[in-house]
Amino acid sequence: MAIRKKSVDTLPDVASDFVWAVSSGSHHEPHSLLGAHPHEKGWVIRALRPMAKSVSAVVDGEKVELSHLENGLWQGYVASKKVPDYRITTAYQDGSVWTTDDPYRHLPTIGDLDLHLISEGRHEDLWNALGSHIHAVKGDLGLSHGTRFAVWAPNAQAVRVVGEFNSWNGIAHSMRVMGASGVWEIFIPGVGAGSKYKYEILTRDGNWITKIDPLAQHTEVPPSTASIVTESTHKWNDKTWLDARTKRDALKAPMSIYELHAGSWRQGLDYRSMADELIPYVLELGFTHVEFMPLAEHPYAPSWGYQVTGYYAPTSRFGSPDDLKYLIDRLHQAGIGVILDWVPAHFPKDEWALARFDGQPLYEHADPRRGEHPDWGTLIFDFGRNEVKNFLVAN
């Protein structure tokens, strides 16, 4: 592979405080420094590789050597009329060499319409806009597969993604804030389904706190608390039941509900094995519906599940989200409707969850007279805030 030297005499200067903020993962817009940026008749490429011996950008089959600026920031020049599709090759002191895609060369993966609807509190599929989602970006070098992350944290000074893929060191994956929306975003190539992650949030008072993803659709089995990137492969087979439901007059049709707590109905069952035992039992008793006590993720196993920490994630105690879909699918195929108990009244104060999510009251009302439940020791949602209403209604 040919090595191309930079073809300009000077590269743009970067203020040391700017470099420090980005290299420490505490800048609100790391993409404004890292990635590819226009310079003279080409592009300057910058990458953050603090422990590197040498760094180069692979462009059009050639290596463009990057020079070390300071504090782990490397930069080099590429003569190109269009934004180059490139990869970063990093050599370390131990002799290892890694070639990876650069998260900071990618455009935002959340659009202006999404941000507008979120701010107005009327995004009907919020779970598709925020959270973590498998994503692919097409470029000259082919598809770049990874995961897009987006989280609402309007009071944060900076937000980083930490996970197994970066050894729980978020400096490599600082997010950018999307204008005044309070939404932070990044696309991380190479991160796939099953990856565990959390968010590191720099609060107004300068402290870093670690939080779960409020829109995560899969979590670790408690007492572990990490969010998990997930991708559904379930194929629904309940069309017959859905069609019949649309034709039925629910106000005139008979209805009898069997309520159960999944954790104690019969011991040792998961979502899939529950289908085999629950369906014949409910049919024999003549019930038309089953109502599950809260299945959203909650930290305290002996409870009924009424203190929820993961509103968009079914509890992992009984399997994956697709396993729950399998159970619901089987119930529908048997002609049994499904009701899920929902808990919008309050949420717990666990420091790793929704409470003071970005260092300030966010999901809870700021006035403790309206934001705290003195009898239960829990927090009450700020129902007057658009984004919070959207979080609940979309759920």
Segments the model singles out, each with a brief description of its role:
Residues 62-71, 171-179:
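Short, surface-exposed loop motifs enriched in S/T, G, D/E and P with embedded aromatic residues
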Residues 146-150, 158, 288-289, 335-337:
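Beta-sheet entry/capping signal
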Residues 47, 59, 151, 163, ...:
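Glycine-rich, histidine-containing beta strand-loop boundary motifs that form or position
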Residues 48-54, 152-159:
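Short proline/glycine-enriched turn/loop motifs at strand-loop junctions of beta-rich domains
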Residues 218-221, 235, 239-257, 261-395:
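Substrate-binding/active-site clefts of carbohydrate-active enzymes
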